[in-house]
Amino acid sequence: LRRQRQMCIRDRIDETDLELYQAIVTVDASTADMYLKNMKSLFMEMFKMADLVIFNRCDDNTNMGSFRRSIKAVNPRAQVGFERADGKEMEQDELLPYDVNAEVIKVEDEDYGIWYIDAMERPQVYEGKTVEMRVQVQRSPKMPPGMIIPGRKAMTCCEDDMTFIGYLCRLNHTKSKTLKRILNNEWVTLTAQIHSEYNEAYDKTMPILTAIRIEKSEPPKEQLVYF
């Protein structure tokens, strides 16, 4: 039924001379958490094509970081804003669970989703930094030689809607004591340097990794990333 309604709306737009310029979604932050817990799949569907998402009626207890990561997981291009009941914009400084100024940023298994979204939103903060994390390797014959995608599987809406999230990684003179060849779907501990490059698909600057060291690792107890 939902798909039929969506098709009906598209048909009506196609019948006019109107051009869809921007899709804006507004969300009542005071009830958003309830919908995320009880109707996540339906709730997240409306964000997939949004250009801008505004959470209104926010207060000091609003979990802005969690809401932002949930939106970015299904639609990385969407801009996400937060407003108080009086219309004033909320400050969005989020306390990160790792030291972004450390010599090596150590991302724990449960914090991968936070790092992934923050690096996407603020690539300049991570420019030139070194990161260490446990990830799963994705390889494809279609990828350029010497490239992998290290990342994690994330549940963005429900168990039937899982997405592999990660950034491209170059293997240039990468060191390893435990691996002669990196296999597809293999779990590794990756130490890499982060840089930023323009991504044509997303029309924005995105992180790209250069591997320094890769070592064989056991899978984490919880292999999925949740938002």
Predicted features and spans:
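Short, small-residue-biased leader/transition segments that mark boundaries at the very start
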Residues: 2-9
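A general "mature secreted/periplasmic domain" signal
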Residues: 14-16
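OB-fold and OB-like single-stranded nucleic-acid-recognition modules
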Residues: 10, 19-35, 42-44, 48-227
